[in-house]
Amino acid sequence: MRRRGQLTTAVAGAALLLGCVAHPAVSQPDHDGRRVLVFSKTAGFRHDSIPAGVAAVRQLGERGGFTVDATEDAGAFTSANLRRYDGVVFLSTTGDVLDAAQQTAFEGYIRHGGGYVGIHAAADTEYDWAFYGGLAGAYFQSHPAIQQAEVNVEDRAHPATSGLPRAWERTDEWYNYRSNPREHAHVLASLDESSYTGGTMNGDHPIAWCQNYRGGRAFYTGGGHTGESYAEPAFLAHLLGGIRWAIGDAQADCRPENGYRPLFDGTSASLAGWQQAGPGSFTLDDDGTLTSSGGMGLLWYADRSFGAYSLKLDWKTSGASGDDNSGVFVGFPPSTDPWSAVNNGYEVQIDATDVPEKTTGAVYGFQSADIRKRDRALNPPGEWNTYEIRVQGERLRVWLNGVKINDFTNTDPARSLRDGHLGLQNHGADDQVSFRDVRLKELPAKPSVRTASQGD
């Protein structure tokens, strides 16, 4: 697989050539841009939407700057050929489509950092190949008739779902799965089983998810049965975001996420426990986004303080200047003065330019983030990022889009992380930073031996 790096100019592929790897209309050296292989071989039911799906991925390649080849020839699955691609899309494949040698080559490709995208019947594929089952996340079990349903968008930062409404209504053939992937994959969206008939997953029905799997990246969406799906702008944006993440052009936290409770869920009701300290404010947008204005002030969670916890939240800078300033404060006492948080707590910074200990991912003024890891994990201005801030005892750790970038221990006797409040900073008139979905899970006061041994 080619080296992951910054996106450069690329072109989309030419017309679909069945039975062989299609060559792009304009050929390029492998180091120029990204390349994606669409694989649509079927050994069982064949979806008549496959040609529309191939054409759609080609169009997404034009929009996203990656070259698209398409094939139904399993002979493309050799180690040498797969190294040409940053991602492989299984487009409504069915049945046993690869032989043992081809499976081994694909496993090696994933283990060396390759990307996988599964669309719809990719979950109805290779039931006797355990590696593939883990990669896809879940196997197909059954489906009711095509009908409209409501999709609950659970992750509003991942590029596959960040542009979707929280409640997304669309028509498709809705799969039931043999198992629930939630424990080992990161669920991006799920079906509201009360909104349609035929759901059999007892009210917890994931329909799109992502995961880091055996060295590679895997994204799956259950949509895409109908040809009309590939003309829907929202579904195409969903698919493009999934491909971009799988091939490494966008970053996201795809670790499993369970047991969190919302502190802010995008509704005005969830702001009841928060108070504004100091000048400025936050505006709640129609899509459930909080955006800072003026300052310097602090929107802090006044309902209660916290000791040991994992705090997750999604954030982005405006994209206009690329240098907006904000931060997430932890471990401070209750106060109507925003400077109390500065002087008594700790800030995990959001700021593109300053000295290292005062830029994004830093514990502001105390410890820089790992700059190399931070820069690789960071999405650019205008795109969403996810922080996890984990506090246990006097230890504070920071993950950016699933990558640990800071590990700080408080030694200042005048400050303590063992109990304190949380807050979001509105820094000034020229700084516009947006937040979504602030959620928290309480933890034991000390990391478990197993967690510590894993380097978490």
Q: What are these language model-derived features?
A:
Residues 44, 146-148, 195-196, 225-233, ...:
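Active-site rim elements
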Residues 138, 142-215:
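Catalytic beta-strand/loop cores that center a nucleophilic Ser/Cys/Thr
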Residues 95-164:
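A glycine-rich, often tryptophan-bearing local segment used as a flexible ligand/cofactor-contacting loop or short
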